[in-house]
């Protein structure tokens, strides 16, 4: 069996799809379906069972057995960078992750988890080293602290433990994310409503490492298949502009004039204006597949979003 926490969410459901593509259907999805719309991410996928996240962690703490587990992909977390309830974030993202990590270590189950580029904060160097890490929000701090915890444990770990610092992920199965969905998703919706696509004023100076979710899932699967341990950036290695995203959306639809809107006050000083993954460490594992450019990935995503 393979366990995917957050399996009804954005990246988790894409990992389930990648596992299905390998012929694996013996998958336990763990999630919180209080937002019932997330079920749609699983409708076209095959899984063996579903478990609520609170019931699951209670079983983990109790030491219950789930049979033979080939791997755990831990994608479940509060991923809202705008959430400021630190007690909630640390319980949900940090304590939960530690319990699951130790369960896997005790049983030598390969453990792959979602970290984040939010661990870096306001830096121009995105390398997996302590000197470049300075998160700007409590979400980023929760991910950073778990990475630090993992770093201390890795030398003694007898089974793979692997964290991925996701950069700006976009693509299919993010519809439920609301305001936290990708720029491409929001621009597509604006055009469908007959509006012009909108970018924040000043965003011409912002550049992000936008990475297609299919590529993210592929790296997760490859690292599992190859027994990789460590903490790795997962982006494309190239920063592209928000304008490049908007241009790709407009090109797909064949209409729309890009407008600018004021930059939100609540995001000032808490917003990463630039991200670009240093992929040196990931490439050193032997992973050599290319990543989709914004033009390629957004075109594929638009075709998926607007499929009939």
From Swiss-Prot:
It catalyses: ADP-D-glycero-beta-D-manno-heptose = ADP-L-glycero-beta-D-manno-heptose. Pfam families: Epimerase. The active site is at residues 139, 177. The keyword Isomerase applies. Gene3D superfamilies: NAD(P)-binding Rossmann-like Domain (3.40.50.720), UDP-galactose 4-epimerase, domain 1 (3.90.25.10). Homopentamer. This is ADP-L-glycero-D-manno-heptose-6-epimerase. It comes from Haemophilus influenzae (strain PittGG). The gene is hldD.
